[in-house]
Amino acid sequence: MSMTPREIVHELNRHIIGQDDAKRAVAIALRNRWRRMQLHEELRVEVTPKNILMIGPTGVGKTEIARRLAKLANAPFIKVEATKFTEVGYVGRDVESIIRDLADAAIKLLREQEIIKVRHRAEDAAEDRILDALLPPARVGFNEDPAQSNDSNTRQLFRKRLREGQLDDKEIEIEINEAVGVDISAPPGMEEMTNQLQSLFANMGKGKTKSRKLKVKDALKLVREEEAGRLVNDEELKAKALEAVEQHGIVFIDEIDKVAKRGNSGGVDVSREGVQRDLLPLIEGCTVNTKLGMVKTDHILFIASGAFHLSKPSDLVPELQGRLPIRVELKALSPQDFERILSEPHASLTEQYRELLKTEGLKIEFKPEGIKRLAEIAWQVNEKTENIGARRLHTLLERLLEEVSFSAGDLAISPDAAPIEIDAEYVNSHLGDLAENEDLSRYIL
């Protein structure tokens, strides 16, 4: 990650409106990963990541920041919900499976990168195998000179036709590696055992091939994947993945507030306090056994988030609070924020609906006053009922464009015709009554 914090925030601004404090904290944390890697090894070991706790109501951008961060980081990243895990010893997934999933994500990420590097070599090798199937080598008698030049010219001619797609529908018989896959279902918490069994069965059938009759375009795709797999060194890949997980891994734990013990409840809850105590060594730094080997979690960055509607950050066990030193509070959205969300981000909601309906030949245009009125209604409904943040806009837009979406095929008009205008009057006529009537908005919006 060589992007500066300012560049990271600028990139996040393309997709997320407001929440500057959260963006800055995440950008600094990401940049610190890069800074740490520039240090001498002795000091590098001592510098641990400063984990983040994001606090804010639902629908204000906590999860979206995580999603966008994953794409920016180009590092092993996994997003999990804290509610999916139970205390060790009980039925369900234990928190160590987070690191195992992170290891899987690292292998997938690095394999894709390696395959891109060897893509051209794999394509050449795949073409040769397809040409061998199309043009079997001529049999040559003893002491006879093979007509190499003729063969070569014919092969080049076929290679040209293959690349131009002229042979795509021709059927050939070709040897393909036999896929050995065994689906094993197991109870939650036993994923490691199923992975080991699947690896065992896969290794038993490794190297077996079978002859298949396929169209050239399908065979080319399969053979290309096969050749790319051969060119990637699995042992080297595992070593790189292990380093990537330990040095650059990022874990985003959502819904952390749901495992916080509420102030007025007594006793110990298996799904709450036990999960927090299991998370402690993971965040502090421990060693977890994965398919890559033993993974140390000391330098993995953990970002936790929660709405904390029914509990407070202080309801988390004190040790966990201490392991999440950076606190960032995300603010509730205002009508102006809703207005910006509808129009400013890259691939905004209004742009998505406009492009979707354009596929039917129907043009719609969102007027500024229509967007403003829609934002006001979203804010009003959130205030009167449950505040679900920007997710309310999805509900309102679906309701607003329901009739247009349903009749789009019938309404499609000539390309020169004027578009359907979504202005304040249109919004009021479709949503005004529902927004004003609290009982209706509670059930419909």
Curated annotation (Swiss-Prot):
SUPFAM superfamilies: P-loop containing nucleoside triphosphate hydrolases (SSF52540). It holds the Pfam family AAA. It comes from the Bacteria. One of its GO terms (molecular function) is proteasome-activating activity. CDD domains: RecA-like_HslU (cd19498). GO terms for cellular component: HslUV protease complex. It is found in: Cytoplasm. Its main location: cytoplasm. Signal peptide: none annotated. One of its GO terms (biological process) is protein unfolding. Keywords: ATP-binding, Chaperone, Cytoplasm, Nucleotide-binding, Stress response. ATP binds at residues 17, 59-64, 254, 319, 391. A double ring-shaped homohexamer of HslV is capped on each side by a ring-shaped HslU homohexamer. The assembly of the HslU/HslV complex is dependent on binding of ATP. ATPase subunit of a proteasome-like degradation complex; this subunit has chaperone activity. The binding of ATP and its subsequent hydrolysis by HslU are essential for unfolding of protein substrates subsequently hydrolyzed by HslV. HslU recognizes the N-terminal part of its protein substrates and unfolds these before they are guided to HslV for hydrolysis. NCBIfam families: hslU (TIGR00390), PRK05201.1 (NF003544). Belongs to the ClpX chaperone family. HslU subfamily. This is ATP-dependent protease ATPase subunit HslU. It comes from Pseudomonas savastanoi pv. phaseolicola (strain 1448A / Race 6). The lineage of its organism: Bacteria, Pseudomonadati, Pseudomonadota, Gammaproteobacteria, Pseudomonadales.
